From Swiss-Prot:
The chain crosses the membrane at residues 3-23. Binds 1 zinc ion per subunit. This is Endoplasmic reticulum aminopeptidase 1. N-glycosylated. It is found in: Endoplasmic reticulum membrane.
Amino acid sequence: MPSLLSLVLTFLAVSSPSCCQNSDTASPKASNGASFPWNNMRLPEYITPIHYDLMIHANLSTLTFWGKTEVEITVSQPTSTIIMHSHQLQISKATLRRGAEEMLPEEPLKLMEYSAHEQVALLTAQPLLAGSVYTVIITYAANLSENFHGFYKSTYRTQEGERRILAATQFEPTAARMAFPCFDEPALKASFSIKIKRDPRHLAISNMPLVKSVTVAEGLIEDHFDITVKMSTYLVAFIISDFKSVSKMTKSGVKVSVYAVPDKINQADYALDAAVTLLEFYEDYFSIPYPLPKQDLAAIPDFQSGAMENWGLTTYRESALLYDKEKSSASSKLGITMTVSHELAHQWFGNLVTMEWWNDLWLNEGFAKFMEFVSVTVTHPELKVEEYFFGKCFNAMEVDALNSSHPVSTPVENPAQIREMFDEVSYEKGACILNMLRDYLSADTFKRGIVQYLQKYSYKNTKNEDLWNSMMHICPTDGTQTMDGFCSRNQHSSSTSHWRQEVIDIKSMMNTWTLQKGFPLITITVRGRNVHLKQEHYMKGSECFPETGSLWHVPLTFITSKSDSVQRFLLKTKTDVIILPEAVEWIKFNVGMNGYYIVHYGDDGWASLNGLLKEAHTTISSNDRASLINNAFQLVSIGKLSIEKALDLILYLKNETEIMPIFQGLNELIPMYKLMEKRDMVEVETQFKDFLLRLLKDLINKQTWTDEGSVSERMLRSQLLLLACVHRYQLCVQRAERYFREWKASNGNMSLPIDVTLAVFAVGAQNTEGWDFLYSKYQSSLSSTEKSQIEFSLCISQDPEKLQWLLDQSFKGEIIKTQEFPHILTLIGRNPVGYPLAWKFLKENWNKIVQKFELGSSSIAHMVMGTTNQFSTRARLEEVKGFFSSLKKNGSQLRCVQQTIETIEENIRWMDKNFDKIRLWLQKERQELL
């Protein structure tokens, strides 16, 4: 997981959608030209794996490995064909034993391969009998992957400059088949016995503890690992390296260890302590003991995503696990804690109970994202993570407001379609609708439901409806009040008594959130004591919403000027009326932003709330203030609110001190001038940036150049000083220049305050000498935070040659790791000097980029959006359309392409409608902030 609310707040973060492509529907032909006996991306249901015996022998000198897989299977109907997954494996021999005993004779199997589906067919001479057990034995060899998936090569350099090689795995979603032939679908769970052959100077680790090590030849050791629990193939993991480790025990006797390269093992203590605390929390919260004897956390030098939940051996980017007490930032501590929490939550949600198929990935990822906040709120209260949750919902809404979005639960089939599911909708929206349900039912009732779900489906697979059925048992629909009244609610209504009892049908309610895309816009119109409600599908791209037929069961919450007690109302129809006990001056819906919807206040509703913010903004919570900012600008996009009124509302920020309203204000305002930077609008762009600095000037001037304060205060300081320095606020620039001179004079040995380092580096990188010095320190730094800060600073250079060099070197991966390339490309794509270079680089190197990062991956989506989605001219739109349409199957159908095209179209409409209004508003309001 990237550091929360970090660099991207200044250079607008892009979404991480993925892509899809159609499966091959032609008559299948095997690699030898013969007819392949199976024509489906999914494996047949009549063969089930029971147990795998895996032997892996990797040679880290030749970068090859060979393996032997013995898989015990059962057959439910007679067949002469065994269909398995295999990708880029050279199978040399395949045999069959008719039984599970090793002493039984082996008979040869005829092998056929169909690479389009990444499948092999093993044909038997005599049919397999229903109800019988068989063992398939396959011997094979392959190259270690040069990418970030399968069984792949990773490298690092020691402090002395020696290059060392290790091998690690990343199998989710469909890459276990790149390491061993298998039944690579999440519902085909089995147990695994793993043996690894290695050089004596290396260490092997896997899902389970080491049972014994045997010397099988001179210079060759075979490690035997304990048998696993029943689990999906994508959770298998093994690493061969020279890592060092530190360990602790949980109260229940689970050994927790953190592994890292030797030079960085001193940065493992924070994650180790966090992991122990979080594992103990989850065992208590879920009322289910962690089922394995150990939990390893390994920091991999080359890693495409943030982390991976392999059962018993979670893997991470170094930046997502290692914490340097001297140099790591407050946001880094927050990010590491959340990432460790996420992966450990998966040990229950995802590993113990797994979605049946990838269409319900959100059952894994939405829950893990949600549990990050539930757990860390308790285990690390000083981080105040509850303040940041609603920001995840805004991220999801950015994607979910587009026509190219998809339901939380949506059909997928081929690997690229599966990879596209790893996006904001599965993660953030999934988490947000769970939080909304928890808020509505109460934390205790919700917890009872998910514990029942986990207990019922342990070591099994589930579908969307299984979760809601578990909740239904907690909240029956027979009209009786249970669980302290949480399942039958009294709520305001338009009935003559002003109250009615509302029975909650969890399944029907939540299906409206998981089986249809998008989210509702709730329009509130107050007439005396009557509050008129209307819901419609919020969708960008039109000021007149199409009648989609979408209807949600919306658990509304509200407070008023007369009562800060949260009131609730379940809106299940297109319109309804709430009758208040008395007239009110203002009403605020979606309290705390716990609901996944946005609100428009009709008539003078926005004027009342604007007045509240100007006169007494602390009357409502900081989350409520931030949600008003977000909702106002979302309404500008669809023509429900004028840009002038939204900008008027945000003027109150000159009196704001809390992190989330300020960050939300920046998230709304920065994209506006980023659009202007890419067009010839220098005068208004400059005026807008000046306005932003004046708006926050008092707060910027109050920032100390220290590391004092809470995590949120430190994160706010870092971002405000960076903003001020990047926009050449002289008080900031002068101090940053002085710090940089002193730091450079010390050859980078002087300790800078961590919170101001980013601003100092950003200023220092603006001349050639400073840029070159920063790059030299990047090469030798052992701190992930410091490397990230330098990387950002190098990317905001105004020197096109430097920017082009960064693109070239990060893509080659020799000096700057290839895993950094998507981020570097996106940062340069946000740079007003660099964006043409980034877009050109993406186009010219598309085929190579897809080979490195896989069609459908979130990295590809990140790069597509990051280089194009701040365009706002018709010429650029046609250029983007033309390029991607020319790719055909190699990219034209990517969801991220549809998203960026929609976004550019929206940018064009937005600028056409609002640019002149902003120019006039700036002239009118200029004096107000002086």
